[in-house]
């Protein structure tokens, strides 16, 4: 319903404001990975132009198959959470449990796309590799920004 959607939007806006105010570098990492996931994946799909599996689909997709956008997106989104988790969860046991669950979630999203018949396993593997590569490139920049922003805030 309309009020539910609007209140959900309001909660997201408030959460983004809090994250921006106190964790700007983490927000930078999320935005960076989201933009790359959207734009980069679309461009790669147009470059490779790989058709989807021809077997019976449980869902209908209208774009090309390689790389899997769900695999890229889940790797980037949940992978980003995995990387910044130490900021938010100090208890090592709880943090490890959450990290394991997020890792299983990333894997299961890939498996579900194969099960639904909309991707080949290589599409999923390519999506995981692309997402992981972008995380490995973005994370050092995030760490540098985090250090600089934390240092600047202590100077004020």
Predicted segment positions?
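Membrane-embedded catalytic cores of phosphoryl/pyrophosphoryl-handling enzymes
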Residues: 54-156
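Helix-loop junctions at the membrane-solvent interface of multi-pass transporters
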Residues: 19, 47-48, 142-145
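Transmembrane alpha-helix boundary/anchor motif
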Residues: 21-22, 38-43, 80, 136-137
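Hydrophobic alpha-helical transmembrane segments
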Residues: 13-17, 42-51, 69-80
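Short, small-residue-biased leader/transition segments that mark boundaries at the very start
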Residues: 2-7
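Core hydrophobic alpha-helical membrane-spanning segments
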Residues: 11-15, 104-107
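Interfacial segments of alpha-helical transmembrane regions
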Residues: 12-37
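Small-polar-interrupted transmembrane alpha-helices in polytopic inner-membrane proteins
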Residues: 30-50, 98-111
